[in-house]
Amino acid sequence: MKLFPMSSTKYYIFLFNFLLITSTTLSKSNFQPKTLFLLVKKDPSTLQYITQIHQRTPLVPLKLALNLGGESLWVDCQKGHKSSTYKPARCESAQCDLAWSTSCGNCYENNTSLPICNSCYNVVSNPVTSTTGEIADDVLTIQSINGSIPGPVAIVPNFIFSCPTTSNLTQNLGKNVKGMVGFGQQSPVSFATQFASIFKFSRQFAICLSSSTKRNGVIFIGHSPYFISLAFDASRDLIYTPIITQQRFVTITYPHYISVIRPSPEYYIQVTSVRINGKTLPLNKTLLSLDENEEGGTRISTNVPYTELEPSIYDIVSKAFINEMPKEVKKVPSVQPFKTCFDSTYIGVSRLGYDAPEINIVFQKQSVYWTIIGSNSLVKVKEGVICLAFVERKEATGQAIVVGGYQMQDNLIEFDLSRRRIGFSNSLFYRQTMCANHNYA
């Protein structure tokens, strides 16, 4: 089996081709937005973060789950899909290359205009499984921002996405959710990268996930400022750590059966240590480093509701957290999926959440760290019981730390792909605001 790495030169050639493909969009727009936005809300049943776009002709509203490490947008086209502007990507076209095609439809009939004939496919996935998807493009609309208020709607006539070849890929998503919107790094057709290429703004986006299942948070795509309230730009408080880029092996079946090395769309960062109430924990440093097989290290994921820790790391964090809890707060039996739980009768509560030990996630040096406070470290599971909102990793292999959605709630997190860095704001509660306090509804 042959191995072919994707060079950075080829990657940027793909981006250049993409600019040519989307040039018609600019001629049809009367404005050049600098920032776009999506509203996003936590689904109470799946704990996934759900947003909505409008796609197709005529336009149809589609609920989609947020996938930080996803390569692209995918939408279920199996049930009731109708669009006069849907265009499948033809084999060996620029769209196929951009969307990292892994195979191409074979023609067994004379009619080569059939969508399933001469169309290319890639891999699409949900948090549990994956399948193949037909690469295509169609009309998509998204709201722009004018300062701290909504601006005009941006219309993209040929946004690249994928249609899974089976309808069961939505089974692990929330009710009426029709797909996933991928914001993965290094992917030429990720949601943010396509808009940056089309409207010629910086490749960056920021998420502000609300802790409420009834009120929306917001996803910003494009330039800051990121106004969470009328007078507060949350991007001013960011501390940055580099994004780690990684490669992975992918099997391609067309035009030849080969294995290629492609960039991973996942977001990896280097965590050097963890402190609880200022005390550095004795973690295995080897586990904190990402290896060539994407094992170890730290990944950021919205597909994980609560931060997952490798078992030995979980034990150390849990014991240290228990030791630093107020003495009057007693342990109680575990409540799945959590192992470390407490009686909440005597724990204090402030605007920062529960009176819990402060957790510092330390990045490239001791002075650069992200602080997790009580509102993000403890979760109420039932009346009178709260639990440490971290879980032990079940799989034998994987990341040492996977930062989950609960820990990101009411924090602004910026993904600056142009500068290869991620910015963390710390809890917006310090600023007496929260992610639901925006003015974009």
Regions found by a protein language model. Name each.
Residues 2-12, 17-29, 41-47, 55-59, ...:
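Aspartic protease catalytic domain
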Residues 10-21, 25-37, 82-91, 99:
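N-terminal leader/early-domain signal
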Residues 148-150, 282-285:
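Short acidic, Gly/Pro-enriched loop/turn segments at secondary-structure junctions
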Residues 125-135, 139-266, 361, 369-428:
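Glycine-rich flap/beta-hairpin and adjacent strands of clan AA aspartyl proteases
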Residues 44-159, 163-176:
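Signature of the N-terminal lobe/flap region of pepsin-like aspartyl proteases
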